């Protein structure tokens, strides 16, 4: 694997569904960690406040529920991912690319139906806690959602 002129490695998993979340804002995640890669082959990833034994995007904030939401692949060709709120108090919100307003997926303490995500949607976890831009690419990552060769900008989803 060789890097391009920007030090970014090409994607080697072209046949597998991946979703990239580009951090737009967060009070709880390290500043230099900007991209989370969700692998759709293994059931996706949970989002929550506490540590977990399964892949998780951990957001240690009281505004985020212990088991806040799930992201998962619903189609490989074309690549499709969905998000579902698991009954959080402060909500999971999605703003479509062409919209200026957010839609809450479900009322407080009620699980939502899966919401199909589209390229460049914005997902907000909690009222104002953390926001991510959704990136769904058929092939290589764009400059905004690429992880550098050193991996320094990747948000780990490993079980903790």
Where are the regions a protein language model picked out?
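Intrinsically disordered, low-complexity acidic Ser/Thr-rich regulatory segments
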Residues: 1-62, 76-78, 116, 121, ...
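Forkhead-associated
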Residues: 55-56, 68-122, 126
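Amphipathic hydrophobic-ligand
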Residues: 64-66
């Amino acid at each position: 694997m060789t890097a391009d002129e920007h030090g970014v490695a090409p994607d080697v998993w072209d046949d597998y569904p991946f979703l990239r979340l580009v951090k737009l804002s967060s009070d709880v995640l390290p500043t230099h960690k900007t991209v989370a890669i969700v692998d759709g082959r293994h059931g996706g990833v949970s989002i929550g406040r506490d540590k977990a034994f399964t892949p998780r995007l951990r957001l240690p904030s009281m505004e985020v529920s212990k088991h806040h939401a799930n992201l998962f692949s619903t189609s490989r060709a074309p690549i499709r991912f969905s998000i579902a709120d698991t009954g959080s108090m402060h909500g999971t919100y999605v703003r479509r690319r062409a919209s200026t307003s957010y839609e809450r997926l479900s009322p407080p303490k009620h699980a939502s139906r899966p919401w199909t995500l589209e390229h460049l949607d914005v997902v907000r976890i909690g009222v104002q806690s953390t926001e991510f831009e959704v990136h769904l690419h058929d092939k290589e990552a764009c400059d905004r959602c690429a992880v550098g060769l050193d991996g320094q900008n990747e948000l780990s989803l490993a079980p903790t």
